[in-house]
């Protein structure tokens, strides 16, 4: 079966909408034949399918990951669709248990209706499944938390022989299961610790990039949540900083019936920068619709309206559009030096920057294979959107390849659910617990039933 193990494949929406093949969400990789997809309606049926499977198995949620994470290798292999295994299973005063196939937006909506929230900040896209978010290390922003997986209290999995095992935080293998890459078993239930829902006020600013290396630390130390977009060519930064709302702001929010309160403000500080970026993006993508999704992700940088709302209303605002997304974690203590290296490299080489550099920082993670394992980290994000015909800007891709190589040289760890060039990384050197993770895999899945070409190369 054709797949990409590295590099950046073209989109093929026409082929993906026809024929017998199942493609990933971005429509740039074939995953399986439709007849190879199994859809269990219960955990018991899933156990039967796993026990009887003649080949290897991979699990799909929303299919938003690169093809290498999900693609099957042989006719006897099967892809498990967990779409029917969703919803809230139970809850108590401090935690809630969801089925693994529950989309994150349903998790957030159910918690909000209960007056609860996760301790972890959400990622920008909420259509992925809870189990998929754990498998790939999905994270948000804020140094007081790390990935969604770090808020897990208990994980229930169907193992390779069809049996079921529950892993709690005290289990010696728990930190392997927290971020398992889909290689240890099929997650059917996840218990997440929760807290009373809070309201946040987010402030939006445009600032010079001159002091970004130090400003980044200040924003993240002084505010509960912070996110920044850096335009190196224009030496500007669009930054969001958020804190818990004051009593007065909370009252305004509740008086607005739980809808976000937007404090309308106008500023032309980013207009020229945004217009230049849009012009370049139009040239790269040849997308004719001026209101197309890629353009909306940029035009919103002209918006400086502060906002009060719950954490999901404020930060879970991604616009899902097909793209190549590369995200590399660097220890926060070294992020400033890496920013300065990127700045010097950009000034010397003047690369074609398709989209601003996204900067999100998190606290240390306990997951053995988390890019933020045991250290506060800054995730450097880079995006190139697909053109109308499914192609990618050659100059934009050249930038991605060069900047990923630079970050890999700095000891960067890539986000598992996004695109990266695996040849740049020495996994055992980057992840001191890699050998321990492999040992857990051998114990839980000695025949490597939950495997494919990519995971075999990664884990052996």
Identify what each model region corresponds to.
Residues 314, 406-460:
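Activity-critical C-terminal alpha-helical subdomain
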Residues 331, 337-389:
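C-terminal structural cap/anchor segments
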